[in-house]
Amino acid sequence: MEETVPSKTEPGFAKAIVTTRAALILTADSGSVSIPWERCSERLAHATREERERAELSPSGYGIHWPLIDEDLAVGPLVRSGRLVS
C-alpha cells in the first residue's frame, strides 16, 4: 500500500510516497528518488507499516515527520542518499 504526502510549499519536492520497502520522494521536475527504510533511519527500518504510513510533510516542505515513532528527517539529505528512479 502507498501513502502520498503532498508538498505545499517546497518547490523542489512535490510529494513523498510511502511504500513497504522505501520512501519515494517525487521532485517538482518529475524526477523521483527511492530511499530504502534502512537508509532513512533505524527507527524507520524497524517501524510497522502503519507507523510509516502516518508520514506528514512539514509545513515548510523541508522535512517529513512520523508522529507515531517521533521521527523527523530533512528531505534534502534523504534525496541525496537515495537512488534516482527513472
Regions flagged by a language model, labelled:
Residues M1-S86:
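Motif-centric detector for short Cys/His coordination patterns
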